[in-house]
């Protein structure tokens, strides 16, 4: 399994150190990958220093992206070519304790949610099969010219399992 997230340069500066520390502490055996929009040389070097694979996906965006384009950021480069399941997180959603992650999925996307004020919060993380990740990437590419108003359309793209977990912040 691969742990994956995506970030623009601002979110990278705010959250990368925490994401890197927690993912290496909780899941040291998992390969880590990050998609970056407009990264600095220093940010690329941080990835190298922490043995985190990265892709610069700036070229996939229009010259002057809007806020709505960034709703697609984490969906445009799910690394399905590794042919491993992908634990996709937001860079600001951190694992706080180990969870028994499924090795074999019987659904396309296994969503991880947490309680928030008595209700289930948004999707904190999800596990994708390589096949479902490819579907999501291809769909996100079709939306870049007309980006969504939120990331909700992408969260609803696949059949998902109800799996609330109180293991992510």
Residue ranges and their predicted role:
Residues 101-157:
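Conserved catalytic core of nucleotide-sugar-dependent glycosyltransferases
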Residues 1-62:
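N-terminal anchoring/stem segment of glycosyltransferases
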Residues 42-43, 95-98, 119-122:
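Short catalytic/ligand-binding loop motif for oxyanion handling, primarily in non-cytosolic enzymes
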Residues 70-111:
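GT-A fold catalytic core of metal-dependent nucleotide-sugar glycosyltransferases
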Residues 159-164, 168:
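Conserved small/polar residues in nucleotide/adenosyl-binding loops
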Residues 11-15, 70-74, 152-157:
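Soluble or luminal CAZymes and related metallo-dependent hydrolases
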Residues 4-9, 35-38, 73, 89-91, ...:
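Short His-Asn-centered micro-motif
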Residues 62-68:
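A basic- and aromatic-enriched beta-loop-alpha substructure that forms the phosphate/nucleotide-
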